[in-house]
Curated annotation (Swiss-Prot):
Keywords: Lyase, Menaquinone biosynthesis. The gene is menH. Its EC number is 4.2.99.20. InterPro entries: AB_hydrolase_1 (IPR000073), AB_hydrolase_fold (IPR029058), SHCHC_synthase_MenH (IPR022485). It is an enzyme of class 4 (lyase). Monomer. This is 2-succinyl-6-hydroxy-2,4-cyclohexadiene-1-carboxylate synthase. Pathway: Quinol/quinone metabolism; 1,4-dihydroxy-2-naphthoate biosynthesis; 1,4-dihydroxy-2-naphthoate from chorismate: step 3/7; Quinol/quinone metabolism; menaquinone biosynthesis. The keyword Plastid does not apply. Catalyzes a proton abstraction reaction that results in 2,5-elimination of pyruvate from 2-succinyl-5-enolpyruvyl-6-hydroxy-3-cyclohexene-1-carboxylate (SEPHCHC) and the formation of 2-succinyl-6-hydroxy-2,4-cyclohexadiene-1-carboxylate (SHCHC). Belongs to the AB hydrolase superfamily. MenH family. One of its GO terms (biological process) is menaquinone biosynthetic process. SUPFAM superfamilies: alpha/beta-Hydrolases.
Length: 252
């Protein structure tokens, strides 16, 4: 079994760019940014429980890494960068720390490196279970209306929230809930030490208005790029700013 993905081919000899979306996104999420790099072959992946991979269920990050590894092999991707937002960034960091043959580097936008104590994990587990129950039982428009009121999305205006609620409500609530629980921050290890000892290139992007993740970025041994005029979802709020940072990283 492999993950559903859309592949776009570029010039031979350059590494692939493998894009991983955030929670409730899909393979289209990164395409406005990715298509600015037409010289590079691009793979836009649907994570388990999402988009064309909605029917794929996992028990945890190890399963996600295994599926990602098999997907890369199926497309004969031998050299690549992982580019991930939020959940996709956490998947990218986990997979990179577990080891992926051919990995050139990891570019993470607003991805959490992991909670640092049992109390934080227990609190997050309670929260994610409550959200998962709502995703399973309530209309998605109602759940996402509340989801985008969370502090991390404080930089969004009302129109942006309405647009995101409408877009994300096309998902399957049950499969979102399952993926939320399987890849909760409550079950993700703290990756700070692994990332400090890494053997791959590591870059971190965060919006200038995303105070939580700017603070987290300062804790990581990563080259950090702050995206102007953006909050947590920087590639959506300022795609040109993210394109500029990726171009600098890739020496485009």
């Amino acid at each position: 079994m492999i993950l559903h993905a859309q592949a776009k081919h570029g010039k031979p000899g350059l590494p692939w760019l493998v894009f991983l979306h955030g929670f409730s996104g899909d393979c289209h999420e990164w395409q406005e940014v990715g298509e600015a790099f037409a010289d590079y072959s691009r793979l836009y992946v649907d994570l388990p429980g999402h988009g064309g991979s909605a029917a794929i269920s996992v028990d945890g990050f190890d399963d996600v890494t295994d599926l990602l590894r098999k997907t890369l092999v199926s497309y004969n991707i031998l050299d690549f960068w992982l580019v991930g937002y939020s959940l996709g960034g956490r998947v990218a960091m986990m997979a990179a720390c577990q080891g992926l043959a051919g990995l050139c580097g990891v570019i993470v936008e607003g991805g959490h490196p992991g909670l640092q104590n049992a109390e934080q994990r227990a609190e997050r587990q309670r929260s994610d279970r409550q959200w998962a129950q709502r995703f399973r039982t309530e209309p998605l428009t109602a759940v996402f209306a509340d989801w985008y009121q969370q502090p991390v999305f404080a930089s969004l205006n009302d129109d942006q929230r309405r647009e995101l609620v409408a877009l994300r409500s096309n998902n399957n609530g049950a499969t979102l809930a399952a993926m939320l629980e399987a890849t909760s921050l409550a079950v993700q290890p703290d990756l700070r030490a692994n990332l400090s000892a890494r053997t791959f290139a590591f870059y971190y992007l965060c919006g200038e208005r995303d105070s939580k993740f700017r603070a987290l970025a300062a804790e990581l041994a990563a080259d950090c790029h702050v995206i102007p005029r953006a909050g947590h979802n920087a590639h959506r709020e300022n795609p040109a700013g993210v394109i500029a940072s990726l171009a600098q990283i890739l020496r485009f």
